[in-house]
């Protein structure tokens, strides 16, 4: 979900591509080192080399191969993302599409599913909440029937993509009123969906930007801990594990405070940039969780390519550019290496759950050309969409998808 515009564009693409399509899988991954079928273009060569070096540093982190690891291998169920909800959703094929994809995820070998059920969709005071509650009840039943472990991210709706009246709902929220409403929704998620994992805070910087109210500054670790405590106070968990955390680009002292001053059951850690500072933060987060006797759940991870500097770029054009370059096939070897290293590391450190973010890349990439690269992000993504649609219809997987299938086996 890092950053706001990045998620926005990713979800628009996911919604456009997945609604109404069946997803099938085939093939297995090679155990050999991944090789690029496309040459790295000169404009990206330096960044590619830097990221490849960072991946080597990631792979060199202490850890050992763990055979028969219990770590849940999952990915996001994009058609069920709350940012795609609309009035009348039960009269569309969105539930059918989400159901089909859940079936295919199990066929791929995955043992878990991540769903974003966004605040305030399930609040009784929010328009059409009964319909959204029914949708999530039904898709949760499908996930449970498939024997998949369900993780829910309770992130706020993104006002820049959702057509729902979320801006007016956010207006005037205070930390206390937001936490009280989030508590109410968390209880509904538990009662209706019965997830194994429920994350109530994952990227405090993104939450702060999305809610955009002067009294809600979750960038402060102290305020973040206060928020988590308010949401969890009196929550009837009924077997659901409730957690929170940050991204690997955020100072690990934030997570240390959450572990020390809140009753979270696990630490949720998002992994995108992997510069040395991010890897250092990540290893500190892992050590802190172990010292607190808490497991780690990774509800989102992917190799960030817009910069190799370790901090996600935060201007208006950065996120569309990231989504644009994600489509190019010369990145496939790095994405394969990232997923392989991420899963190995998660298993070696006994993470409970790991779930990649850019699942459309499991199905297709496209060849870079200078002419394509000169086009807008919207046009590049439109061309990518056609390739994803063809792969979904034919049952194909990209090399990255085959790698993940091999990892999940």
Task: Spell out what each predicted region is.
Residues 2-31:
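Secretory targeting and sorting signals
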Residues 26, 31-87:
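Mature N-terminal, pre-catalytic/accessory segment of carbohydrate-active enzymes
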Residues 77-97, 168-177, 246, 324-334:
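Active-site mouth loops of central-metabolism enzymes
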Residues 101, 153, 222-225, 239-242, ...:
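Glycoside hydrolase catalytic-domain groove-lining segments
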Residues 297, 301-409:
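Substrate-binding cleft of secreted/luminal carbohydrate-active enzymes
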Residues 68-75, 113-115, 150-154, 196-200, ...:
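Hydrophobic faces of well-ordered beta-strands that scaffold small-molecule active sites
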Residues 91-120, 151, 195:
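Catalytic domains of carbohydrate-active enzymes, especially glycoside hydrolases
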Residues 123-135, 160-262, 276-291, 337, ...:
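Active-site cleft segment of glycoside hydrolase catalytic domains centered on the general acid/base Glu
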